[in-house]
Amino acid sequence: MRYLTAGESHGPSLTAIIEGIPAGLTLHPADIDHELQRRQGGYGRGARMSIETDRVQISSGVRHGKTTGAPITLTVINKDHQKWLDVMAVGDIEETLKLKRRVKHPRPGHADLVGGIKYHFNDLRDALERSSARETTMRVAVGAVAKRILAELGIDMLHHILIFGGITITIPSKLSFRELQERALHSELSIVNPKQEEEIKTYIDKIKKEGDTIGGIIETIVQGVPAGLGSYVQWDKKLDAKLAQAVLSINAFKGVEFGVGFDMGFQKGSQVMDEITWTPTQGYGRQTNHLGGFEGGMTTGQPLVVKGVMKPIPTLYKPLMSVDIDSHEPYKATVERSDPTALPAAGVIMENVVATVLAKEILETFSSTTMSELQKAFSDYRAYVKQF
């Protein structure tokens, strides 16, 4: 399985092409639209999300509600493009029109300046448009297809926010996977403690009035993955490494942890390692899950626990100082439309990116020309692991 995305933030549309999806997977536009709508939701989103109503168009690879095994083409129309026809025109236009919405005051924390240097851009909008988080629309669309595969194999997942702009969410003890999932899904903030909703919303409103932004830490949990996915035989086959790369590729993500993560640096080995158990009904298991479901780059059969830290959004309505790329004089950074926080949306993106990596690993590990073939191979492997 592989995919490409294309499109600019204010261009006509966004596109993804996915190759390697088994034939026979039940797939409807509504499956993808559901995830796209989740990405657009959440408290703290800005005006762009009130303009766009993301709906996918499937133009290849699916017939009569089933995948055919051919490449799948997904497209999402940018409604806002109608206001940017001159700025984002494909053909050549008058010089005066080229200066319209030109970006020459790069924003600290964005790809504007370095992208302009690398690709020799006189207008930094050429970097801004593609590096925008709008691109993640299509990664969510791809992830929605991946989640359909995982669901057919009995794999489920959730995400929730652990830290919201410096406010630590108190996680009620002994919540089951399903309870965590339901609480996060029914929260505008993707948190599992409803008692903290108003406190955080008030804080977001305050940050917005200040023209500032906040980040935080997101946790994704995956249930139902059997032991043995990934490999220790080469560095690039380790599944946790693949997940780390994928999570860090999401806009504004600056760190990844598995299990208790960086807290391991403060603990002894006897406190961190997950003791092994065995029962006739369950087979091998672990007493704890400090390592987040990974050992030696492979899944252990425990829930996968992946955490990602998102920096505050770099576009500030009270802009930081920058430099004019023409005169090299100090100047306030360009202001583009932005949100005080996008943590709930980032959680949806992270969840779908993780789903894509896991689906790809499964498709590369098991016979998967068709879904029935994949389901049989996966079921047989689960049975083997249980009796080992």
From Swiss-Prot:
Family, per entry: Belongs to the chorismate synthase family.
Domain of life: Bacteria
Cited Pfam families: Chorismate_synt (PF01264)
Source organism (scientific name): Streptococcus pyogenes serotype M4 (strain MGAS10750)
Free-text remark on how the cofactor is bound: Reduced FMN (FMNH(2)).
GO cellular component entries: cytosol
Residues bound to NADP(+): 39, 45
Binding site for FMN: 130-132, 251-252, 296, 311-315, 337
GO BP term (any one): chorismate biosynthetic process
Lineage of source species: Bacteria, Bacillati, Bacillota, Bacilli, Lactobacillales
Keyword Amino-acid biosynthesis: yes
Gene transcribed to yield this protein: aroC
Designated name of the protein: Chorismate synthase
Catalysed reaction equations from the record: 5-O-(1-carboxyvinyl)-3-phosphoshikimate = chorismate + phosphate
